[in-house]
Amino acid sequence: MARLQEIYRDKIAPELVKQFGYTSPMQVPRLTKITLNMGVSEAVADKKIMDNAVADLTKIAGQKPVVTKAKKAIAGFKIREGQAIGCMVTLRGAQMYEFLDRFVTIALPRVRDFRGISGRAFDGRGNYNIGVKEQIIFPEIEYDKVDALRGLNISITTTAKTDEEAKALLTAFRFPFKN
């Protein structure tokens, strides 16, 4: 069992029950999945760029990503229907907790000029999104072997009903919110 999973079961869940007064243990918010998405618009011109992005995301997530394809053609972006435009990976269970642990304790402190993450990026239904500007903050990515700096979007999906509950859950997981 992952370290954060044990902390959730032993400390965070009972703390949230006290804080919000839940009557059933199934009401306690928990993490459902973490989705990592990397949009690679440059892949339209060069196929090797997509291979490098897939390799980077595989190292970060520890799981092979799915290549996402364009649903319809957009002439302004020079995209045809079915063309590879990004990659994504969904983490659940132990892998999700392991990634969250590495992200909060190792990757976030490596961000340049880091002052905490925004507490306003909740979607109104208890899910949180964070954008990472460069993939080199993850220790799995070797700085010398990176062909280009690419950002990625990290979506954290919870069972929380409100943003307040989700923020309490993520704060208990030691998320460094600045406001």
From Swiss-Prot:
Keywords: Ribonucleoprotein, Ribosomal protein, RNA-binding, rRNA-binding, tRNA-binding. Gene3D superfamilies: 3.30.1440.10. GO terms for biological process: translation. The keyword Repressor does not apply. GO terms for cellular component: ribonucleoprotein complex; ribosome. InterPro entries: Ribosomal_uL5, Ribosomal_uL5_bac-type, Ribosomal_uL5_C, Ribosomal_uL5_CS, Ribosomal_uL5_dom_sf, Ribosomal_uL5_N. One of its GO terms (molecular function) is rRNA binding. The keyword RNA-binding applies. It comes from the Bacteria. SUPFAM superfamilies: RL5-like (SSF55282). Belongs to the universal ribosomal protein uL5 family. Part of the 50S ribosomal subunit; part of the 5S rRNA/L5/L18/L25 subcomplex. Contacts the 5S rRNA and the P site tRNA. Forms a bridge to the 30S subunit in the 70S ribosome. This is one of the proteins that bind and probably mediate the attachment of the 5S RNA into the large ribosomal subunit, where it forms part of the central protuberance. In the 70S ribosome it contacts protein S13 of the 30S subunit (bridge B1b), connecting the 2 subunits; this bridge is implicated in subunit movement. Contacts the P site tRNA; the 5S rRNA and some of its associated proteins might help stabilize positioning of ribosome-bound tRNAs. NCBIfam families: PRK00010.1. This is Large ribosomal subunit protein uL5. It comes from Acidovorax ebreus (strain TPSY). The lineage of its organism: Bacteria, Pseudomonadati, Pseudomonadota, Betaproteobacteria, Burkholderiales.
